[in-house]
Amino acid sequence: GLPVGGYTAWLERMAADDRIEVRLDTDWFDVRDDLRRQSPAAPVVYTGPLDRYFDYVEGRLGWRTLDFELEVLDTGDFQGTPVMNYNDPDVPYTRIHEFRHFHPERDYPSDKTVIMREYSRSAAADDEPYYPINTETDRALLSAYRARARQETAAARVLFGGRLGTYQYLDMHMAIASALNMY
């Protein structure tokens, strides 16, 4: 299930802790040397693409990305569920989200609903990666990157997490469990 108030409220409460510094529009690779000099023993949780962390030294891992299409429909309920997945070869999108069903306790207009379609495609170098690709080539690269990640964790206290940092498909409950198990 969802946290009370949704993930945004949950993350806002965590980020409000005085021990947490939040930097927006900041690329880790632009600030990491300064941050490591300031706090060399501090652990780092890296959740970006695993291959990018190591400057693609083993090669580029394959990723899928998503394009989104938002639409307001003139109906009070489009699909009766928060997310409907589609794997039919003749359907161009992979899923449809209908946001009103994530929080049924809230009041919504009875004559309108908002949906979002997700379209999956191979990620180009400048796209935001979302999902790992499980090919033989990617598995070989991943093995080499995981060996590097283990060394980096031991030497520099860098913890690799999330879908991108572990190159794993993770549902939210799996990502949360993985983060809790890091410590």
Where are these regions (language model features)?
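Short beta-strand to alpha-helix junction loop
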Residues: 1-13, 23
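A conserved beta-strand/loop element that lines the FAD pocket in flavoprotein oxidoreductases
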Residues: 15-29
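Short, well-ordered alpha-helix to beta-strand connector turns
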Residues: 18, 40-42, 155-156
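A structural signal for the hydrophobic beta-strands that form the central parallel beta-sheet
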Residues: 22-24, 46, 160
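Domain-scale detector for complete catalytic domains at protein termini or as standalone homologs
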Residues: 22-23, 55, 166-168
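Mid-domain catalytic core of redox enzymes
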Residues: 26-148
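Short FAD-binding loop at a beta-strand-to-alpha-helix junction that anchors the flavin cofactor
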Residues: 152-168, 175-178
